[in-house]
Amino acid sequence: VTKATEAQKGGSFMSQYSDYGQLKNTFSYSTGKMKDGSAVTAVVSNTNGDGYVDGTYVRANSYFLSYAKDLNKDHMLTFTAIGSPQEHGQRDRMLTPEEVEEYGGKYNKDWGYYNGEMLNQRNNYYHKPQFALNHYWDVNDKTQVASSAYVSVGKGGGSGPLGDYAPTDE
């Protein structure tokens, strides 16, 4: 998947729905290797809906992009970007055996309604994309050299009973 020049030309779409109300749509497309020796592969998805545990949810996107270019018969460059910005509610506290017996395993005591809107005591958000540049060199029939440079930057945080938390640059 990461070497777009090796992918077949074409695309696909897939939609998945869980029994607890989560919908995920995924689209992918690859140009295949074009006449100029380059190729692009992209995959994007979106997930939204309720979580398996009561009072939890997910709102997430994900993306993958790969651009590859054969510079000549011995050298190829690729650029890859991948990431998944997301936000989700969670259950923070473990249930006692008595709570599981009385309310079931999906019970979540960390949420409720406030002014008519769902309020979850614990929410997280996160996005840490990665970007990579790779060079592949076929030195001869027995020797190949691969080199990579990448960067990853991210931001995330969450909320809890003590308020919101997000790291700062200070």
Feature names for model-found ranges:
Residues 2-10, 39-48, 102-116:
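Flexible, solvent-exposed coil segments and beta strand-coil junctions
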Residues 1-14, 25-31:
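N-terminal periplasmic accessory domains that precede
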Residues 68, 76-136, 159-170:
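Acidic/polar loop-and-plug regions of large Gram-negative outer-membrane beta-barrel proteins
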Residues 17-48, 53-91, 126, 130-139:
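Transmembrane beta-barrel wall of Gram-negative outer-membrane proteins
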Residues 147:
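Active-site loops and adjacent core secondary-structure elements that bind or stabilize anionic groups
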Residues 151-153:
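Acidic, polar low-complexity intrinsically disordered regions
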